[in-house]
């Protein structure tokens, strides 16, 4: 499985998480880019390269943050890149074996942290345990005003990262405890299900 992610923090999170729920000898490689635009700019050439050598058993997963983009339009662009490269996407495949799946973290990777607050609490024991029950945090994919900023504020309020959130360090720490089966983020669940389907 080849997983393309937009930034090193996503790579760090997934390196901690994926080995705990990928079974049966399946392997994966993670390829981080320098932001969403960098990945989107390089994606057509990367997918064209894959289309020339991809073995039947390989699967590609492309993961992007939605940020403040129109998620439907972003997904359309990602799907068009797959079609233009001659790769069969999960969306287009229906019941056929697919080669590539496009997934979007809504709105940002940090929403997935809010979806698994137990993992955050294990990595950062001083954070309040009731955060998921607070108004504005109940749906991890609908946190207003910037997910990473909200996450940073909570950590800073209890003495972590006073100089600013170190995203890769936090991703690594939380990924080590993340439970793929209990995350409340719908966008995480869509990603997890695609991974499980890819390794069947």
Give the positions of each predicted feature:
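N-terminal beta1-alpha1 ligand-phosphate binding loop
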Residues: 1-14
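C-terminal accessory helical subdomains adjacent to catalytic cores in phosphodiester-
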Residues: 11-37, 41-61, 66-200
């Amino acid at each position: 499985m080849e997983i393309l992610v937009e930034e090193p923090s996503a790579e760090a999170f997934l390196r901690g998480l994926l080995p705990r729920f990928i079974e049966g000898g399946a392997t994966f490689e993670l390829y981080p880019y320098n932001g969403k635009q960098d990945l989107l700019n390089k994606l057509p050439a990367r997918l064209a390269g894959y289309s020339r050598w991809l073995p039947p058993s390989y699967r590609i997963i492309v993961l992007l943050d939605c940020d403040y983009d129109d998620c439907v339009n972003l997904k359309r662009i990602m799907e068009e890149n797959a079609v233009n490269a001659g790769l069969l996407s999960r969306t287009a495949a229906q019941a056929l074996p697919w080669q590539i799946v496009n997934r979007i973290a809504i709105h940002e990777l940090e929403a997935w942290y809010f979806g698994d607050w137990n993992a955050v609490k294990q990595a950062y024991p001083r954070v309040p345990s009731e955060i998921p029950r607070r108004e504005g945090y109940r749906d991890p994919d609908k946190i207003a005003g910037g997910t990473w900023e909200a996450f940073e504020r909570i950590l800073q309020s209890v003495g972590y990262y006073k100089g600013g959130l170190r995203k890769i360090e936090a991703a690594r720490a939380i990924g080590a405890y993340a439970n793929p089966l209990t995350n409340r983020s719908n966008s995480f669940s869509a990603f997890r299900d695609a991974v499980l389907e890819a390794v069947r």
